[in-house]
Swiss-Prot record:
Organism: Marchantia polymorpha
Protein name (database record): Putative ATP synthase protein YMF19
Record has ATP-binding as a keyword: yes
One Pfam family cited in the UniProt record for this chain: YMF19
GO molecular function (one): ATP binding
Membrane topology of this protein: Single-pass membrane protein
Length: 172
Protein backbone atom coordinates (compact mmCIF):
# COMPACT_ATOMS: atom_id res chain seq x y z
CA UNK A 1 0.00 0.00 0.00
CA UNK A 2 1.49 3.19 -1.11
CA UNK A 3 -0.34 5.36 1.47
CA UNK A 4 1.41 3.72 4.38
CA UNK A 5 4.84 3.97 2.86
CA UNK A 6 7.43 5.34 5.29
CA UNK A 7 8.39 8.18 3.01
CA UNK A 8 4.85 9.44 2.39
CA UNK A 9 3.54 8.53 5.84
CA UNK A 10 5.13 11.51 7.55
CA UNK A 11 3.95 14.07 5.01
CA UNK A 12 0.44 12.62 5.02
CA UNK A 13 0.33 12.78 8.80
CA UNK A 14 1.54 16.42 8.80
CA UNK A 15 -1.01 17.46 6.21
CA UNK A 16 -3.72 15.59 8.07
CA UNK A 17 -2.85 17.44 11.28
CA UNK A 18 -2.74 20.79 9.45
CA UNK A 19 -6.16 20.21 7.89
CA UNK A 20 -7.66 19.03 11.19
CA UNK A 21 -6.17 21.95 13.07
CA UNK A 22 -7.44 24.51 10.52
CA UNK A 23 -10.83 22.81 10.55
CA UNK A 24 -10.82 22.86 14.36
CA UNK A 25 -9.77 26.54 14.49
CA UNK A 26 -12.35 27.57 11.89
CA UNK A 27 -15.05 25.57 13.59
CA UNK A 28 -14.08 26.89 17.03
CA UNK A 29 -13.88 30.55 15.90
CA UNK A 30 -16.71 30.73 13.37
CA UNK A 31 -18.93 27.67 13.50
CA UNK A 32 -19.50 27.16 17.20
CA UNK A 33 -20.47 30.81 17.94
CA UNK A 34 -22.96 30.73 15.06
CA UNK A 35 -24.38 27.45 16.30
CA UNK A 36 -24.61 28.78 19.86
CA UNK A 37 -26.34 31.96 18.58
CA UNK A 38 -28.84 29.84 16.67
CA UNK A 39 -29.54 27.71 19.75
CA UNK A 40 -29.97 30.81 21.95
CA UNK A 41 -32.26 32.37 19.33
CA UNK A 42 -34.37 29.22 19.23
CA UNK A 43 -34.65 29.18 23.01
CA UNK A 44 -35.64 32.83 23.00
CA UNK A 45 -38.23 32.25 20.25
CA UNK A 46 -39.69 29.29 22.11
CA UNK A 47 -39.99 31.36 25.29
CA UNK A 48 -41.48 34.24 23.30
CA UNK A 49 -44.00 31.91 21.72
CA UNK A 50 -45.17 30.99 25.19
CA UNK A 51 -45.32 34.67 26.14
CA UNK A 52 -46.75 35.46 22.69
CA UNK A 53 -49.52 32.97 23.27
CA UNK A 54 -50.28 34.73 26.54
CA UNK A 55 -50.05 38.10 24.79
CA UNK A 56 -52.32 36.91 21.99
CA UNK A 57 -54.82 35.88 24.66
CA UNK A 58 -54.40 39.35 26.16
CA UNK A 59 -54.91 40.89 22.71
CA UNK A 60 -58.08 38.87 22.22
CA UNK A 61 -59.28 39.99 25.65
CA UNK A 62 -58.40 43.61 24.77
CA UNK A 63 -60.36 43.33 21.52
CA UNK A 64 -63.36 42.00 23.42
CA UNK A 65 -63.07 44.79 26.00
CA UNK A 66 -62.75 47.45 23.27
CA UNK A 67 -65.75 46.03 21.43
CA UNK A 68 -67.86 46.05 24.60
CA UNK A 69 -66.74 49.60 25.42
CA UNK A 70 -67.61 50.84 21.94
CA UNK A 71 -71.01 49.16 22.09
CA UNK A 72 -71.68 50.64 25.52
CA UNK A 73 -70.67 54.13 24.37
CA UNK A 74 -72.84 53.83 21.24
CA UNK A 75 -75.79 52.70 23.37
CA UNK A 76 -75.24 55.58 25.79
CA UNK A 77 -75.04 58.07 22.92
CA UNK A 78 -78.23 56.68 21.38
CA UNK A 79 -80.07 56.77 24.70
CA UNK A 80 -78.95 60.33 25.43
CA UNK A 81 -79.99 61.52 21.96
CA UNK A 82 -83.34 59.77 22.20
CA UNK A 83 -83.84 61.18 25.70
CA UNK A 84 -83.05 64.67 24.45
CA UNK A 85 -85.48 64.34 21.55
CA UNK A 86 -88.22 63.09 23.93
CA UNK A 87 -87.51 66.04 26.23
CA UNK A 88 -87.72 68.48 23.28
CA UNK A 89 -91.03 66.99 22.13
CA UNK A 90 -92.40 67.22 25.66
CA UNK A 91 -91.30 70.85 26.01
CA UNK A 92 -92.90 71.75 22.66
CA UNK A 93 -96.15 70.07 23.71
CA UNK A 94 -96.02 71.82 27.07
CA UNK A 95 -95.39 75.18 25.43
CA UNK A 96 -98.24 74.65 22.98
CA UNK A 97 -100.58 73.48 25.72
CA UNK A 98 -99.91 76.21 28.28
CA UNK A 99 -97.75 79.09 27.15
CA UNK A 100 -98.80 79.39 23.51
CA UNK A 101 -102.44 78.47 24.03
CA UNK A 102 -103.59 82.10 24.01
CA UNK A 103 -101.62 82.82 20.86
CA UNK A 104 -103.05 79.73 19.16
CA UNK A 105 -106.55 80.73 20.26
CA UNK A 106 -106.09 84.26 18.89
CA UNK A 107 -104.77 82.83 15.63
CA UNK A 108 -107.78 80.53 15.20
CA UNK A 109 -110.14 83.39 16.07
CA UNK A 110 -108.50 85.67 13.52
CA UNK A 111 -108.77 82.96 10.85
CA UNK A 112 -112.46 82.59 11.66
CA UNK A 113 -112.99 86.36 11.56
CA UNK A 114 -111.24 86.59 8.21
CA UNK A 115 -113.39 83.85 6.68
CA UNK A 116 -116.58 85.37 8.15
CA UNK A 117 -115.62 88.83 6.90
CA UNK A 118 -115.05 87.45 3.40
CA UNK A 119 -118.53 85.92 3.42
CA UNK A 120 -120.01 89.18 4.74
CA UNK A 121 -118.16 91.17 2.08
CA UNK A 122 -119.53 88.97 -0.69
CA UNK A 123 -123.06 89.15 0.72
CA UNK A 124 -122.84 92.92 1.22
CA UNK A 125 -121.49 93.45 -2.27
CA UNK A 126 -124.18 91.27 -3.81
CA UNK A 127 -126.95 93.09 -1.88
CA UNK A 128 -125.59 96.57 -2.60
CA UNK A 129 -125.09 96.16 -6.31
CA UNK A 130 -126.14 92.74 -7.54
CA UNK A 131 -126.06 93.63 -11.21
CA UNK A 132 -122.57 95.13 -11.08
CA UNK A 133 -121.09 92.29 -9.03
CA UNK A 134 -122.58 89.49 -11.10
CA UNK A 135 -121.93 90.98 -14.54
CA UNK A 136 -118.40 92.23 -13.87
CA UNK A 137 -115.88 89.64 -14.92
CA UNK A 138 -112.72 91.57 -14.29
CA UNK A 139 -110.86 90.41 -11.21
CA UNK A 140 -109.41 93.83 -10.48
CA UNK A 141 -112.84 95.45 -10.09
CA UNK A 142 -113.98 92.69 -7.72
CA UNK A 143 -110.84 93.03 -5.61
CA UNK A 144 -111.13 96.80 -5.29
CA UNK A 145 -114.81 96.53 -4.46
CA UNK A 146 -114.11 93.93 -1.76
CA UNK A 147 -111.29 95.99 -0.26
CA UNK A 148 -113.53 99.05 0.11
CA UNK A 149 -115.77 97.24 2.60
CA UNK A 150 -114.60 97.97 6.12
CA UNK A 151 -112.97 95.46 8.41
CA UNK A 152 -114.79 93.92 11.35
CA UNK A 153 -114.13 95.22 14.86
CA UNK A 154 -112.45 91.96 15.93
CA UNK A 155 -110.01 92.25 13.08
CA UNK A 156 -109.26 95.83 14.09
CA UNK A 157 -108.44 94.64 17.62
CA UNK A 158 -106.19 91.88 16.29
CA UNK A 159 -104.36 94.30 14.01
CA UNK A 160 -103.96 96.73 16.90
CA UNK A 161 -102.49 93.97 19.06
CA UNK A 162 -100.02 93.07 16.36
CA UNK A 163 -98.96 96.70 15.82
CA UNK A 164 -98.74 97.66 19.50
CA UNK A 165 -97.32 94.38 20.78
CA UNK A 166 -98.65 92.37 23.70
CA UNK A 167 -100.09 94.30 26.62
CA UNK A 168 -98.40 93.98 29.97
CA UNK A 169 -100.65 93.01 32.83
CA UNK A 170 -100.85 95.46 35.68
CA UNK A 171 -99.87 94.11 39.05
CA UNK A 172 -102.27 95.28 41.74
Amino acid sequence: MPQLDQFTYLTQFVWLCVFYMTFYVLLYNDGLPKISRIIKLRKRLVSQEKVGAEQSNDRVEQDVVFKECFQASANYLYSSVSGASKWCKGMVQLANAHKLQRMNKDYVCSLGEISVSQVIKKNALSTLSPSTYQTTSLASRQTTALNKIYVLRGQKRTLAKIKNGPRKKKIS
